[in-house]
Amino acid sequence: MLNKINKIYKQGGLIFVFKKFLSIAFRESKNNLRAAYFKLSTSENFNFNGRKLNYFRHNFNLAYANERTIEVAIVEDFLKQLPKDARILELGNVLSHYGFNNIKRDVLDKYDPAPHVINEDVVSFNPQLKYDAIFSISTLEHVGWDEDVRDPEKIVVAVTNLTSNCLAPHGVMLVTVPLGYNTYFDEQLSKGSSYFLEKYFFKRISSKNQWKQVDYVDVAGAKFDQPYNNANAMCIGIVHA
């Protein structure tokens, strides 16, 4: 901490340190007030396949202002419907950032150094004990796309491996993938290629971060960061073993 303060002091002197402190204090106060508001107020809701779900709201990564607001809500509802003794795998260490530490699950993430995370590649992960349920929040689009050597087709291998080698008989997998980010994934969808047995789509419809379930034709060609920040359309994919 002292090293950070000393570094800031060298950059701009005592006044700069004071301004930096005020900026951090203001940001933290605003975050705390927003968190309190989330706890004390009732969230609006949206519909997913006839089920009314509350928008998820959280400060981390501005979840209240982007696609996380529906992704986490959909995944939370998915998990609530599972048997209590279900073996669960999360692809990508996401939920732990939003306070879901009480959900017993394994977490597979090739790059996350957290001690509870399995650091293996999703394309080759082959556990002895298979999982009754697998879920992933905005992670698959990065597989093969945001790696040192780009391999767009790796996402296909990942989905195939998860369903063939990780999912138990009668198991179910649910993933959320933003449209407009991984153009290979988008192209495959437009050609009718099916990664998932079931596909559902959401479109962001307002600057207030409201979302609506729509048909694919309504989100085909959706852009990332246009017209709103982050995802403007989402694909919810489901596979039953």
What are these language model-derived features?
Residues 59-65, 144-156, 184-191:
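Short, flexible/disordered intra-domain loops and linkers
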Residues 83-95, 147, 173-201:
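Conserved class I S-adenosyl-L-methionine
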Residues 18-83:
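Class I SAM-dependent methyltransferase Rossmann-like catalytic core
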Residues 99-128, 133-136, 154-158:
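Adenosine-cofactor binding site in Rossmann-like domains, unifying the SAM/SAH pocket
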Residues 191-241:
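Class I S-adenosyl-L-methionine
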Residues 151-172:
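A short glycine-rich, Lys/Arg-flanked "PGG" loop and its adjoining helix->strand segment in the class I
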Residues 135-140, 144:
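A conserved beta-strand element that flanks and buttresses the S-adenosyl-L-methionine
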